[in-house]
């Protein structure tokens, strides 16, 4: 996929995304730590859940169980009492079982490879990549809903039922500057959540607006002033109401 993107375009994309993030990136508590346990908790809780709802649960869970060993020792019912109000109730069990498995490892050392991380319950390619980037500072592609949408729109990839497979994963890896996966993946998640939204995308303030394939190619309604935006969205641009993952 890297060979399909001109080097100049890729570098411009990286620069604009990182410059935007330096000013507009979200300040989230799990971005102030490199503890793989805390990062795993944040990713599991954030699955298909808005950040505003995740924050109090994340803070409460770590207040009660500040380490992976503390979570492993806790009764499952106590863990689920904290996590279940978010919905998707299996994640409390996932976290508890993952903690038990980590605690059983020699020295209780947290997994440090993609393969080891993906052996934990509830941990797929995305979550394993997040821990690799944010805890271990090792470049790995990350595709959540927002990043997938941003990359698909900007580089003109077709939307498919399996949009996070194949070409998109290769593209997500190709846009990472060497040694900067930690920061650009956070930047892409924020840009997708706050600007390149599924509905009413804020194209007019997007740092990538001049190079976005979907914005450039979007047809204008007959007789209307051209205000290009990613198809199929038709909403007027507006300030973000709340950040979404």
Where are these regions (language model features)?
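Catalytic cores of DNA base-excision repair glycosylases
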Residues: 4-9, 15-231, 243
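Charge-dense, helix-prone N-terminal extensions
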Residues: 233-236
């Amino acid at each position: 996929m890297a060979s399909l993107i001109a080097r100049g375009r890729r570098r411009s994309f990286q620069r604009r995304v990182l410059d935007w993030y330096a000013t507009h990136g979200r300040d989230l508590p799990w971005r102030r730590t490199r503890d793989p346990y805390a990062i795993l908790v944040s990713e599991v809780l954030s699955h298909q859940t808005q950040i505003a709802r995740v924050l109090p649960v994340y803070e409460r869970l770590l207040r009660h169980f500040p380490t992976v060993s503390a979570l492993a020792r806790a009764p499952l019912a106590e863990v689920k009492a904290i996590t279940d109000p978010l919905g998707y109730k299996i994640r409390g069990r996932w976290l508890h079982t993952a903690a038990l498995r980590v605690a059983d490892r020699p020295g209780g050392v947290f997994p440090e490879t993609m393969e080891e991380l993906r052996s934990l319950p509830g941990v797929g390619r995305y979550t394993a990549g997040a821990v690799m980037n944010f805890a271990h500072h090792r470049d790995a592609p990350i595709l959540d809903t927002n990043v997938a949408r941003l990359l698909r729109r900007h580089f003109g990839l077709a939307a498919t039922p399996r949009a996070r497979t194949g070409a998109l994963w290769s593209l997500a890896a190709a846009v990472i500057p060497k040694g900067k996966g930690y920061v650009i993946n956070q930047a892409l998640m924020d840009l997708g959540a706050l600007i390149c939204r599924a509905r009413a995308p804020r194209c007019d303030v997007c740092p990538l607006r001049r190079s976005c394939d979907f914005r450039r190619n979007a047809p204008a309604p007959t007789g209307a002033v051209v205000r290009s935006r990613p198809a199929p969205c038709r909403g007027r641009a507006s300030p973000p109401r709340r950040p979404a993952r």
